[in-house]
């Protein structure tokens, strides 16, 4: 799957009011999920220097994700081109990488 991820951060001064409003709008509360994230790079940190990321994540599913700068940058928000695939075996994929 390929898409553009846009990261937006907000200063929240009244978290409880926001939480209540979201619940009024019908939010579906999910339980917390612990996730394991592993980043991979070469000894020269080539991915990091090129503002890219290769990550293996385990939570409810196992996913391998590659993030890089998008072809068209957004001056207002932090954006990444993101490629992601589901992986059936976390441990084996870790060994491959």
Where are these regions (language model features)?
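N-terminal strand-loop-strand beta-hairpin
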Residues: 1-96
């Amino acid at each position: 799957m390929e898409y553009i991820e846009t990261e937006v951060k907000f200063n929240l001064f009244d978290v409880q009011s926001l939480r209540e409003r979201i619940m009024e709008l019908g939010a579906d509360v999910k339980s917390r999920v612990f996730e394991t994230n592993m980043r991979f790079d070469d000894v020269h940190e080539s991915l990091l220097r090129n503002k890219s990321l290769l990550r293996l994540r385990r939570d409810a599913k196992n996913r391998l994700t590659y993030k890089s700068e998008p072809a068209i940058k957004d001056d207002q928000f932090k954006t990444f081109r993101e490629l992601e695939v589901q992986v059936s075996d976390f441990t084996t994929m870790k060994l491959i990488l």
